[in-house]
Amino acid sequence: AEKNETHPLIRHLNEKGLAARGDENIISEARALAAKTRKGQFAPGKIIQCVEEAINLDDFDEGMKKEAEYFIECLVNPQREAMIHIFFGERAASKINDVPKETPKLDISKAGIIGSGTMGGGIAMCFANIGIPVHIVDQDEENLKKGLAAIERNYKFMVDRGRMSAEQMEKTFGLISSGLSYEEISDVDIVIEAVYENLDLKLEIFKKLDEAVKDDAILASNTSGLDVDALADCTKRPEKVVGTHFFSPANIMRLL
């Protein structure tokens, strides 16, 4: 079918650019936003420069030259290769070799955390943030209070920054409970140990967890370098023991 309307060439579309020339805040606001949301990244600044040239230049061909110039700068910048690596790495992380696609996923409806320090609190937030109730266990009641207070401060900071509403904070923070007894996490589907790096301490914890939580629960350790096989061997369910090292701060860093 024939189209009755025609579309002008891009080089002839200058109404928006001309209108923006009188607004000094457009570019400054864009730079401020990029500095806040794309800290340290090179390309966003060059993209903004392209827009700035499009607004202020009268010669379309000169604008195209500027765009090509800025593109080459991005192309040779070391960040390019790193950003490409991150892009494909994030997608590859969800694909595990030799694990069939039809492998069923475990249903995680409740989680437990051992330790209420920086890592324990951050990991608890990871679960709460996706709607999974989580119970933190610590042998020291004062540490528990400090840990929960730190979590609450983190959420309040997010509210202050506009990253979540006060209602969302109340609902999410409400998913986090705490206590002093391993019996309180007997029904969790996964429990993550997040105490300091001491193998003897972790072995003691895993022996207690093996007795306390249900038989099909996953026992995980946040250890960064200790032998996970040694932790597995001290339990009656070695096939259910895994290492899950969260990068700190766990509630912010995406790397696991």
Where are these regions (language model features)?
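NAD(P)+-binding Rossmann beta1-loop-alpha1 motif at the extreme N-terminus of oxidoreductases
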Residues: 93-154, 177, 212
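Conserved N-terminal Rossmann-fold NAD(P) cofactor-binding segment
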Residues: 141-189, 199-204
